[in-house]
């Protein structure tokens, strides 16, 4: 290093020139501000200043660390791009003074000395306790020995004093004294041993308590040591400085810290593929471990009425495969998403060692229904009368005369296809009527009518007598345990035979009062009106005998008679109120649907606000089209009504899936044996729910082993574009019963060529479907013999082979027809007639009594006396 001026040195050292000149003078070097300063002179000055100030070193040190790394980052184009990352760290370390270090060391020595003194005192206390216990044991033993010696001496003196022969009493006394002596010795020894054991146990307890306390203190020291703030850096100097600093701050507990496990050191400083060393891994302070349960865990499993296999496994905290295995061991096959009943789930859970708690899923439903069933004052109500009978026996005409309105004209074909609900005011009171269909397809609708009624009027035509639907109506009335009034209609027609009607009805236990029975018979004419007043009187008389009553005030309850989807008004339900009052704004729960009553209309279409018992009304505002026959109940809370409806929908779906699964398993082998079955796919739309249900039931009954009716889509309301798309995709025919397709659906049906049919009478619908099913039946084939020829001679042809010279004995022989060669009435060959000639001319056919030459294709073994039988196959169409 070159010499520099004193002025420049003063600037570098941040000192004035006068102070620097004075310091050089004190060091024995004379300098002025303009003089040069050599390296040796600088060292001399530095040594002088260090001696003068005691050689103090720096108390503060600042370390700076800079690390660079490269990151590969994907850019917007998707290509990798290298990014340089530089991390800078700066730490300052302050050196403690010697006095602080000495104080820390003195404190450490004092703590260590105190711990050693404490340990020594405890050891001395233990020694004293043990020595004391031994001394007490020796003293007790010595005392027992002295007592024994005294007793022996006393016995000896007694023996010396008494020199006579020992008596039996003396021997007994000697034995007693010996036993007493032995007992005293044993008691003394036991007492000494007990005291010694007690003292040893106390000493051991003291040692254990001290050991536990020392272990806790040691653990606390270790935790305190491990809880320190360590600064991990890649610089060795900085790490060493931090270790020294931390050890001084933590004291002796730092020295007792264990070394790192070799497993942790194993992976430190590994080289990567690029050759650079990785940073040492920081040991994780958080350690977690799973301990296997010592015994199987018993859980409380809550099981409802239905549950899937996956849900059951989740509640038992096991895999679904384990549940399936357990079910297979018990002989039940199941899949992970299959719904199983409560009983099966209970058996499986108990088999797997869990406690089962059975729950009712319909608790909310029961609570809501209990709230709705409020008691009140019961008052008399009007009777609900259902008119039943065979088709075209005059049920609707009779009701029409009673209502003084033409109802039958509104029904297509003059037959009733809906349940009509009406109430009639008479001079003697009000009567509510339900008019049911008489056709065979409407069995379920008649059944609903019988269940919702008080009295059944059985209409029987005087000229027809008892018919199949008449018998069915009698069965429905008996099943519902409803009184039955027979109305013999059409008494004004020729051929009316009352006795015949009575006789036929008596075969079904319907006996008139005239013949000593219980059933009321009335004779009416719906056309003229004869006997109608007597019928009404009979109805009211029967109602008085039944003493009909209902709660007039309070929440309403009833039954859904019919339902439909109106294009402008939405879901419409016809409800017969049975209890309470149904008002506008009430929250109504109908089976799977719910909603607020937005509007109510009577049977004439007039708006009303309140409907009491035995009044049929049309209700608007439900969430969907309810099923006919569902119970309708007014509830207080709309939220609860929605929850109950959703629960019922889920339950209905589960039951439906379970039934389908059962049907699949039951019919699996039957389907495998049956092979291919033709299917007629149908998309069915009807105007009301009852008609839809009746048509579906009738169509399903048409299915046979060879042709199956598959209703892939059904609904209430007009034919929509969705229905047309479904039919197009599945190759189905679209049937509309009293409904029409909208514009978009008609366009799609026309473009896709979907088969669309409209019907207003159920007879025509069923006949058309039956005809379509007949077209799907596989045709039958029958073989018909057209001619027989006897072989008289056999010729050889170089081109064809054997030619049979024949005489046609029956029918006509036609060329290219299939033939059979018979020898002694046994078929030996079946083939095709290839050549047919007569006098070298090729002919298309040869009639009876003519000779011809016949060449059989691929057959040369024709002999004289054989018969050639010519036949044709005729296709015969089958019908259901």
Curated annotation (Swiss-Prot):
Biased composition (Basic and acidic residues): 142-229
Chain residue ranges for the region called G2: 414-418
Primary location class: cytoplasm
Compositional bias segments (type: Basic residues): 269-279
Region (G1): 389-396
Region of interest (G4), ranges: 489-492
Binding site for GTP: 389-396, 435-439, 489-492
Claim: GTP-binding is one of the keywords in the record: yes
Segments of skewed composition (Polar residues): 69-78
Chain positions covered by the region annotation G5: 525-527
GO cellular component: cytosol
Subcellular location: Cytoplasm
Gene Ontology molecular function: any one: guanosine tetraphosphate binding
UniProt entry tagged with the keyword GTP-binding: yes
Residue ranges of the region described as G3: 435-438
Keyword entries, A-Z: Cytoplasm, GTP-binding, Initiation factor, Nucleotide-binding, Protein biosynthesis
Domain of life assignment: Bacteria
PANTHER family registered for this protein in UniProt: TR-TYPE G DOMAIN-CONTAINING PROTEIN, TRANSLATION INITIATION FACTOR IF-2-RELATED
Family: Belongs to the TRAFAC class translation factor GTPase superfamily. Classic translation factor GTPase family. IF-2 subfamily.
Protein name, per record: Translation initiation factor IF-2
Organism encoding this protein: Psychromonas ingrahamii (strain DSM 17664 / CCUG 51855 / 37)
